[in-house]
A protein has these predicted regions:
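Amphipathic alpha-helical assembly/interaction segments
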Residues: 1-138
């Protein structure tokens, strides 16, 4: 794994820890519990799916897991925005998490797009380098 991937692994993990800390500070009422569960799943999913992508056994698996991590980051931003706009939860932690969630979402989305493009490029190059199929002669 390279340095960039290692740093992103750490950022996704730190984001997940931030989400845990945020959820622990929520008031103990039904609405906050339900919203907190959704945020917790999505926030942990960013790290879990990115880490899984890094262990991918194939380009296809890497791209799929990276796409899921991107979706989880997007969902985390949704829940954090809902907390911010409704005035639920610790405001300062929510704002910093929202900023980090937006950054992670952008990084993961761009990485996902680049990985898909690179895979398509490899496929095209592989097709071009194959010798033409011989037609049977009768």
């Amino acid at each position: 794994m390279n340095d960039i991937a290692d740093r992103l692994r750490q950022r996704t993990f730190d984001f997940a820890l931030g989400v845990i800390g945020f959820c622990r500070q929520l008031p103990d009422s039904w609405v906050e519990r339900e919203l907190g569960k959704q945020l917790l799943r999505a926030g942990m999913g960013v790290a879990g799916n990115y880490w899984s992508a890094c262990r991918g056994r194939s380009d296809k698996e890497f791209i799929a897991k990276l796409g899921v991590a991107t979706d989880e980051a997007d969902e985390s931003v949704l829940w954090l925005t809902a907390f911010e706009r409704s005035g639920i939860g610790p405001a300062t932690d929510g704002k910093s998490l929202l900023g980090e969630g937006n950054e992670l979402r952008a990084i993961l989305a761009k990485s996902h797009k680049t990985a898909r493009e690179n895979r398509q490029k490899k496929k095209r190059e592989a097709r071009r380098s194959r010798p033409p199929a011989h037609s049977p002669t009768l």
